[in-house]
């Protein structure tokens, strides 16, 4: 029976697991999107979302609490200066998990985990697809185009051969 087994240990000791989650959280904050297994992504989501919530109020105490979990100055400043400003009006759900299939070597289920407000690539492709779509037929599209102006003809005389 699975009593009192609240979280996934990920096959690691407690110190290894906390170090791995801290490093993955720093990578997620720096790069905004990382590729990992689904189990690690779910554990990372539980780890990083309270830190993002804590970063919304920029106080000395909240910075110390976040730094004790991340241990990376660059990640902490990035979190408090850029990410917290972008997610200030969002009440939670700062990360998204997108499953990408199975890994070739061991068939592990892989996914992307990304910050929700930093998905510029997905937003650009969605608008690009809408812009290129048209319902006009080719015949009517060709008729509406202006006919090309006739090109000025220039004739060059070849030098006379003797």
Swiss-Prot record:
Any Gene Ontology CC annotation: cytosolic large ribosomal subunit
Pfam families: Ribosomal_L17
Compositional bias (Basic residues): 130-139
Record-linked InterPro entries: Ribosomal_bL17, Ribosomal_bL17_CS, Ribosomal_bL17_sf
SUPFAM superfamilies: Prokaryotic ribosomal protein L17
GO molecular function terms listed in the Swiss-Prot or TrEMBL record: structural constituent of ribosome
A biological-process GO annotation: translation
Keywords: Ribonucleoprotein, Ribosomal protein
Keyword Ribosomal protein: yes
Gene3D superfamilies for the chain: Ribosomal protein L17
Stretches with biased composition (Low complexity): 140-153
Domain of life, per lineage: Bacteria
Region of interest (Disordered), residue spans: 126-162
Family named by the database record: Belongs to the bacterial ribosomal protein bL17 family.
Subunit (UniProt): Part of the 50S ribosomal subunit. Contacts protein L32.
Protein name in UniProt: Large ribosomal subunit protein bL17
Gene: rplQ
């Amino acid at each position: 029976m699975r009593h009192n087994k609240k979280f996934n240990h990920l096959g690691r000791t407690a110190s290894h697991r906390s170090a791995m989650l801290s490093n993955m959280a720093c990578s997620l904050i720096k790069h905004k999107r990382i590729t990992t297994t689904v189990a690690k992504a779910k554990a990372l989501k539980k780890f990083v979302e309270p830190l993002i919530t804590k970063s919304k109020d920029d106080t000395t105490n909240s910075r110390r609490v976040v730094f004790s979990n991340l241990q990376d100055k660059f990640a902490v400043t990035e979190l408090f200066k850029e990410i917290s400003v972008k997610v200030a009006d969002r009440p939670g759900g700062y990360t998204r998990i997108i499953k990408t299939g199975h890994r070739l070597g061991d068939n592990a289920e892989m996914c992307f985990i990304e910050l929700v407000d930093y998905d510029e690539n997905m937003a650009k492709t969605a608008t690009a697809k809408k812009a290129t779509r048209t319902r006009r037929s080719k015949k009517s599209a060709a008729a509406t185009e202006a006919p090309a102006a006739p090109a000025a003809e220039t004739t060059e005389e070849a030098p006379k051969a003797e």
